[in-house]
């Protein structure tokens, strides 16, 4: 039988062939309709296919026939006849009809089987649902049973717990009663005769039961003391009943506890000598019952070698201060303290290991140890290096002065703060080691601001004495100096020094560093910084003001020398050497004062820069502190500004006096009224002009260097105005002809070219007007009225110059001008 169809017997190609028999199994699994169809028709078509293959090459096969290889028909088909083209069509139709009939039958069979299966499934489903319902009812009943059982178990458990509690309470009461009986028995033993400890139980004398004895003794003493306290309260209330108390027991217990404590301490010391940490720990644990073990802790700390060995203290002093009799320096002390405090930290660290292994409360022991270290060992060395000096009679600067004490204080404070941090890292329990460290320096810090200000004052006085000594030494080595050459010697020897001001700032900066170190609160820091900075302002103000005053004294001496020269000239009419000496003194004093002004400006700039970089940031956190310091700085420097202003006025007077002297001595009457002798006119400036410009160029060189900004502009403007007035006054002493007018124009060009270097527009304008006015000496008389038509404001000055014309009277210029300028007549 082939795949898909089972044949019952042979069949032919006729229409009346036997029907196909299809099996339902053919439709199970991977069913293929193509395969079924091929199996049905393969027995009818092979002859047709062979004939087609023989009759026509290239026509190909009928599509789908080659693939029909599955299935066969019952019987063998007859050879194909050549009459009809497709003779098996009837057989195929009959075949298909039979197949359809069998397929219908098969479907009915399948439908029947499906109905039967549905009924069976429905029946089984009903049975299954009924079974599940019964199971659920059984589970619910089971849960209820478990709940009842759990409730009974809980009830039984609670009852058992209550019974256990009662049993435990009863056992505790029994134990307490037993202990109370024992305690009462022991208490009665202690309440015997005063001081009689011989009849005590063996417990209190057995060394192996010391811990138990100590615990019982402490309980008995607490009870006895409480009983005495209650009796005292009742007596105070008037309810006391006469009877014997427990005073004897308390006294005997105290004696026994003291004796036991001393015995344990002795055992503890012996174990400590042997480094027997186990025995030490046992003793410490028992001793902790006596006053919480305070005596044992203190005893252990007090017996440390660093607290009882005198050689340790001597070694500390040698390490920090060096050999006896030598003057210690802050740097050496800093190194010594660092080494000493490192040794102390290492020792405390080693002790911490022992304390942790021995004591039940190591933190409390460490607190006592660290406190003892700071209060005894550290305080001992601080007392040696910090001897507080007296402000009434401070040590001299040659021996270090107050500054040495302050530097030592700062070094000691820094190193001790570092020690406190190291000890905190090692461990010091609940001890506030930082606060304790601060307390070691409290007496020094309370008076620190006064010592700092006194030190700055002492340094300033020492510096001034040093400068005065140097000046006196130079003066003595120079010998006798003539008045003409020595007018400014004393001033130059004590000239303002920027280096000295830098020293002031350096001292103050060091003081501010210490102030920052000692002042933890912003308000305190701001107040101390302000006070210390005020010291600097006072020092700089006094120093530069005195320096400017000395430079002014030199200017005054030069002015006095000029006055003597003038008086001498009036009397003797000849003092050329004296005049030159006075001029040299004036020029020297001018330059000296300009140097003083320049150094004064540099000094002020240094102070202002120092304030901006170091002081202001410390004052800003406190309201008003920064503004107050700025105001103080302005007030302090105003004195120096006033001295500088007066000195600059004197400088102008000195320069004008010398210019006046040069003009008076060098200007000749013929300079502006040359005779008409046929010689060509001299177009060079006059000798007086040349001398004046050369003098001004030389002397003002120092002013250009020393002054700057608005100060320079104001000084040169004032000098230019004074020079213009002086020249006007000077020229009104002469008579001018046209050649002299040209000479005057040449002088004016020199003066104008020089004053342009002043950079003062108002001065330039005045000298330009002088050049216009000088034209009155050059133009013809008839051109004078039209000369100032565009400049009516200078007609008054021009009229005074016109009167200096040589032909003023001969040309009757007064009459002409009065008619043209009636307002000026």
From Swiss-Prot:
Q: Does the keyword Transport apply?
A: yes
Database matches in Gene3D superfamilies: 1.20.58.1970
Coiled coil among the record's keywords? yes
Keyword set, alphabetical order: Coiled coil, Cytoplasm, Exocytosis, Secreted, Transport
| Localization of this protein | Cytoplasm, Cytosol; Secreted, Extracellular exosome
Chief site of localization? cytoplasm
From the record, what ranges are coiled-coil? 244-266
Q: Which GO terms describe its cellular component?
A: cytosol; extracellular exosome
InterPro entries this protein is in?
Sec10-like, Sec10_HB, Sec10_N
Pfam families given in the database record: Sec10_HB, Sec10_N
Q: What happens when the gene is disrupted?
A: No visible phenotype, due to the redundancy with SEC10b.
Question: Which Gene Ontology BP annotations are present?
Answer: exocytosis
What tissues has this protein been observed in?
Expressed in seedlings, roots, leaves and flowers.
| Top-rank taxon, per record | Eukaryota
The protein's job, in short, is: Component of the exocyst complex involved in the docking of exocytic vesicles with fusion sites on the plasma membrane during regulated or polarized secretion. Involved in polarized cell growth and organ morphogenesis. During cytokinesis, involved in cell plate initiation, cell plate maturation and formation of new primary cell wall.
Annotated family: Belongs to the SEC10 family.
Complexes and interactors = The exocyst complex is composed of SEC3, SEC5, SEC6, SEC8, SEC10, EXO70A1 and EXO84B. Interacts with EXO84B. Binds to EXO70E2. Binds directly to B1L.
Q: What is this protein called?
A: Exocyst complex component SEC10a
Q: Which organism is it from?
A: Arabidopsis thaliana
List the gene name. SEC10a
